[in-house]
Amino acid sequence: MAHGRKPWALLSSLLAALMVLVGCAGPEYTYVTNSSDRTYLKVPNSWRPIDPKAIDAALGLDTTVKDSERGLWLQGYDADASPSPDHLFGASAAAPATLIGVQDVPMSARGSYSLDKLRDLFYPVSPSSQQQAAADPTSVVQDLSVMSDEVLTPGDGVRGVHTVFRYRVAGGPPQVMDQTLYLNDDASKLYLFFVRCSTECYQQRQKEITNVVSSFTVLEKL
């Protein structure tokens, strides 16, 4: 007469099967790193990389020049099914898109970077720049309003600013950008990061976006 399997044996088999399933599951996050400049970001694995050459072209950079030659490292990721630099810099992004970068600062420019200059790296965020943009009929940025602004001093001489703001570009729908900019101790390196999408997207996916923002880490060289 055949006997049924003992409960502990059945449980052991189920646990073994579960471990196999866990082991086969893909990673939950993609880790974006620039080890030489000790810069790190974590994005959901569903966010796909944006073609670096497409980012360069969107910024008007020479796509044939290597990052090391121009002193600029950039990486973009997009939660949209069709990753595009338009979702970083265009009028609208229905899903979160993020850009992370490190730029060498020329010796002649190292004394010119104030916190307001960091705030204004992508859009006219500082009060004075907002006033200038409002008075300029050719400005493509409209209805910019700062939601939060925080000066950052994480240590090791690194300093910067974290700003979240609403805005519209070229008459497009309202967007939200969450940006963090840092300078290292001697202002020889500029570290940049932002994630943006529509206001509806930002509200619906705020936890996901906040996790990405909080993962952005810059460490001064030892």
Residue ranges and their predicted role:
Residues 20-23:
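C-terminal motif of bacterial Sec signal peptides marking the signal peptidase cleavage site
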